[in-house]
Curated annotation (Swiss-Prot):
Cofactor: record remark: Binds 2 magnesium or manganese ions per subunit.
Binding site for Mn(2+) 2: 260, 262
Native source species: Shigella boydii serotype 18 (strain CDC 3083-94 / BS512)
Function, as annotated: An L-glutamate ligase that catalyzes the ATP-dependent post-translational addition of glutamate residues to the C-terminus of ribosomal protein bS6 (RpsF). Is also able to catalyze the synthesis of poly-alpha-glutamate in vitro, via ATP hydrolysis from unprotected glutamate as substrate. The number of glutamate residues added to either RpsF or to poly-alpha-glutamate changes with pH.
Coiled-coil region list: none
Binding-site residues for Mg(2+) 2, renumbered to this chain: 260, 262
EC code: 6.3.2.-
Name by which UniProt lists this protein: Ribosomal protein bS6--L-glutamate ligase
């Protein structure tokens, strides 16, 4: 097969591993910067051009689209889809997952347990917003934040009010969430491919922090997950219509809670921690589903 990887930086670990895994299985691979793709939208002869040339047909596309370029990145991916390329995560699913409010609404509607969460835009009644999620301590986030940026733990009501007021000055959407103290700065990252959790790690925040993101210096170890956690991770990915997802789970006293569903999970931390060839599993999933039937379904 001919496979395109959409990424701004082909030197990143995840891109290199996906390329390596695809080549090992006999596929042709090209890494394309989605921002350098430009599209001819024409009912008679739509096409995608890249750096002065018309791109050939790709059997499959692996989107590694960063949050900062979600709009144009998903637009480029839609064009590949329209031309009959199988996407490892459809554009509409990626856009949905990037909308934190929409994601939580969908997960809640499916009965998937979440931390008690409130979302507001420049709330006038800060006190009521705090009460709505059960009071302090609580976590205050910018809805647009990623990798733990724009996330603050407010341990007292006064601190919570101060943080919310400061965020309100940014004219930003604010997410207020109960703090799961018993998780002790740890979460579980489940890597879902299709209908299977192929790997799971426990991420622990560095000392003095409560954010377990590996990008912020957190540590990782292999996690043994329960059947309930496995079921919830798969259900969360399926709810978001993602073939590949990183599902972050907190272990609370009342049971596992889904924190986030990531549509473009990094592979470095979880592959190096578990030793599992996740990139290879992703390529095998593509081999299974990038079929003539998909092209016929999409008109490709």
């Amino acid at each position: 097969m001919k496979i395109a990887i959409l990424s701004r930086d082909g030197t990143l670990y995840s891109c290199k591993r996906l390329r390596e895994a695809a080549i090992q299985r006999g596929h042709l691979v090209e890494i394309l910067d989605p921002l350098s793709c430009y599209m001819n939208i024409n009912p008679a002869a739509s096409s995608i051009h890249y750096k002065g040339r018309k791109l050939p047909h790709f059997d499959a596309v692996i989107p590694r689209i960063g949050t900062a370029i979600t709009f144009y990145g998903t637009a480029a991916l839609r064009q590949f889809e329209m031309l009959g390329s199988y996407p490892l995560n459809e554009s509409v699913a990626i856009a949905r997952a990037r909308d934190k409010l929409r994601s939580m609404q969908l997960l809640a509607r499916q009965g998937i347990d979440l931390p008690v969460t409130g979302i507001a835009h420049s709330p006038d009644d800060t006190s009521d917003l705090i009460d709505m999620v059960g009071g302090a301590p609580l976590v205050v986030k910018l809805v647009e934040g990623t990798q733990g940026i724009g996330v603050v733990l407010a341990e007292t009501r006064q601190a919570a009010e101060s943080v919310i007021d400061a965020f309100r000055g940014l004219n930003a959407h604010i997410l207020v969430q109960e703090y799961i103290k018993e998780a002790q700065g740890c979460d579980i990252r489940c890597l879902v491919v299709g209908d299977e959790v192929v790997a799971a790690i426990e991420r622990r925040a560095k000392e003095g922090d409560f954010r377990s993101n590996l990008h912020r210096g957190g540590a990782a170890s292999v996690a043994s997950i329960t059947p309930q956690e496995r079921e919830i991770a798969i259900k969360a990915a399926r709810t978001m219509a993602l073939d590949v997802a990183g599902v972050d789970i907190l272990r609370a006293n009342r049971g596992p809670l889904v924190m986030e569903v990531n549509a473009s999970p990094g592979l470095e931390g979880i592959e190096k921690t578990t030793g599992i060839d996740i990139a290879g599993k992703m390529i095998r999933w593509i081999e299974r589903y990038a079929t003539t039937e998909y092209c016929l379904k999409t008109g490709g």
